[in-house]
């Protein structure tokens, strides 16, 4: 089974508790900066005896879980939004950690009236149907379906901004919006043995995963249970299969040199036409192969009229240099490079 978005267990527990009449609270990181263990968007559901998710772990998380349980036991339904400073010398709001970062944590005891929003959020994550989670001091917890979000003022700006996964406005009239589903989409072009191994590794890394191949009845594609989407396509139409976006990652590993070349020509041509504000339609574009093979592919792209600047966007040979040999080892080296691309601002 494909892995669901990381937050799904949080909302599933919250929905089940509300249906059963069991007190439950949500914890959420609305802002993070520096070396904060909890990143923006991290969430937990907390009951008297169980939890789902995480807001960063350690003593800070333990204290917030205990505070949530105290609120649930006392029946205090007032939300609490508080900064947490991970420095010993901080004059206030010390978290008990020394990571040197900061995060704003929201404690939100859920009420029966929240069930409709919680259920809708759970369903959107299960089906990958999109929409927005919206939290605010003024309107509480809401789910906005895609069509509504597109006409909802400030949310409309986020809906049309491919980079706008989370948006937070601090202060007394605080507000938080988050696009539901996976932030990052990984497309593997080629459905062979390394593709299958990479799919299994990427399943744990919170990617929405698509695997494409031009070969029907390919056993390694048919048996790929980690991919959310599997399609047999004509590589001449590859550009139409991969929408542009700053959270799009593309790994090319087709059956051979010729099909790699076809795919890369179309994707680099797409790069000329579909640039994002960052100047390139994809966060990552790489091709698997030996140094000799990749050099030959680059030569072919030059012969096809692509500039050195355009060709420089292509990464290859892909994977961190860990002397990998087996499909599983190669997959781990590629996954590590994808993480590097995800976390490096100047990648």
Regions found by a protein language model. Name each.
Residues 217-221, 293-296:
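Short, charged/polar "capping" segments at the starts of alpha-helices
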Residues 282-283, 288-347:
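Adenosine-phosphate binding glycine-rich loop
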């Amino acid at each position: 089974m494909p892995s669901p978005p990381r937050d799904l267990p949080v909302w599933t527990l919250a929905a089940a508790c509300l249906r059963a009449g069991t007190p439950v609270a949500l914890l959420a990181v609305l802002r993070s900066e520096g070396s904060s263990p909890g990143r923006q968007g991290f969430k937990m559901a907390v009951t008297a005896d169980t939890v789902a998710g995480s807001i960063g772990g350690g003593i800070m998380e333990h204290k917030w879980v205990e505070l949530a349980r105290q609120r649930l036991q006392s029946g205090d339904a007032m939300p609490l939004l508080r900064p947490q400073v991970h420095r010993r010398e901080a004059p206030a709001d010390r978290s008990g950690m020394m990571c040197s970062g900061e995060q704003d944590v929201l404690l939100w005891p859920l009420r029966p009236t929240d069930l409709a929003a919680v259920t809708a959020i759970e369903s959107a994550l299960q089906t990958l149907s999109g929409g927005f989670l919206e939290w605010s001091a003024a309107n509480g917890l809401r789910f906005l379906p895609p069509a509504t979000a597109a006409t909802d003022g400030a949310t409309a700006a986020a809906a049309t901004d491919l980079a706008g996964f989370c948006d937070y406005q601090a202060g007394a009239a605080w507000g938080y919006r988050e696009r539901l589903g996976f932030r990052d989409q990984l497309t593997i072009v080629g459905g062979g043995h390394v593709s299958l191994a990479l799919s299994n590794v990427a399943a744990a890394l919170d990617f929405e995963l698509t695997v494409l191949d031009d070969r029907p009845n390919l056993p390694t594609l048919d048996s790929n249970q980690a991919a959310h989407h599997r399609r047999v396509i004509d590589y001449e139409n590859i550009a139409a299969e991969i929408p542009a976006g700053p959270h799009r990652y593309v790994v090319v590993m087709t059956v051979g040199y010729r099909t790699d070349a076809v795919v890369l020509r179309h994707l680099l041509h797409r790069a000329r036409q579909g640039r994002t504000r960052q100047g390139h339609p994809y966060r990552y574009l790489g091709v698997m192969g030996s140094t000799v093979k990749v050099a030959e592919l680059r030569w072919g792209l030059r012969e096809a009229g692509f500039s050195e600047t355009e060709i420089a966007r292509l990464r290859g040979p892909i994977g961190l240099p860990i002397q990998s040999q087996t499909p599983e080892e190669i997959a781990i080296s590629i996954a590590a490079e994808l993480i590097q691309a995800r976390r490096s601002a100047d990648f």
